[in-house]
């Protein structure tokens, strides 16, 4: 290992620092899940002057705007996205010339660890420098219009006009057509195990400008900086830059075509692939044969422990689960219990009693989360979940207010002000019960009802769900629910 030669400061990052590889669920929670438009591009892969189009001024300017809009942390050179516009105005032409001469060398990415959904496990992400993000974005803008039309109809991740919900709905269509057994494929450390030679070979079938393949290969081999030390990357594709999602789709399109050739029903969102079969026996056979193909032909690794065959009602896909409706046996979409727990953990975080924040600040954060969460999960049957969660969240808010009143004298006064009799106000105002227990008592519930909490700026899961229903987000909204 070589020392990177520059002192680098680190902090614990989360997926929110990293705009290119957020999950569909996280994008929705942030209210930024907007399928991107593919820029107009009339070129083909056979274009031997593709590199000139990549570094064309207009294409680079568009790439700068997109990278600035996406934000994110700085790479190893500490240049921020705010500095990009000025940098490219001054150095853009020289940079383009360096790339055209084949002399440009991408900088190593900064490797960071973020928590995975499984407790105690971490995911490695690579953060390229902001300049390299722009170049990768410029490459993606030229390649996307060429490759996207060739991708499978069963592929939904990181594609214009497609989203996770489409993949989940397609799953239920297959399930309700009799394909009720699922092969839930898990590719082990997909981005870290991509065979670079295989990737270059697949690219060369379409891209006839060898300079472009060479530039992409340099990005794959740019290396990483880990704890201030440089490490080579002779395998894998950095899970970090704007080009990574496209490269993953190009590689896994090989899997899609093989599954189509075999006549399988399947859906894929990035490296999350589900194959649906009519029987458990057929699913087991499919799992074994497709595992051999993935490892023998694509040189990727299948996680045999996590790749399972199960009934469709037992699996989790993109945060959703499936259940069989009793009245007619139809397979329906639900929010998976793990996703429910994750949502509650986030609400707890946003409504902690020990935070000295105003309700305006709390409600702003909570409302943004609720909107994003419901917008993502709105295709699920979640009317009851929304109602129950609203009641639980309101109790959380009441505990905050009860704690804010602190002294018995203040509590008695505030309760009386809200229509509680003096006798009852004294009884509750001097009670030694804890905040959570007090928040459920009839007097507190009456004094701090829905109207009061709404007046503090908080929205509800139910009202947001009804909005999603009104715009066609789900087919099973039913009548409005009363929020407790």
What kind of region is each of these model predictions?
Residues 98-113, 121, 150-316:
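Conserved polymerase palm-domain catalytic core
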Residues 19, 23, 378-432:
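Conserved nucleotidyltransferase catalytic core and NTase-mimicking acidic/glycine-rich helix/loop elements
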Residues 73, 83-108:
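Amphipathic alpha-helical blocks
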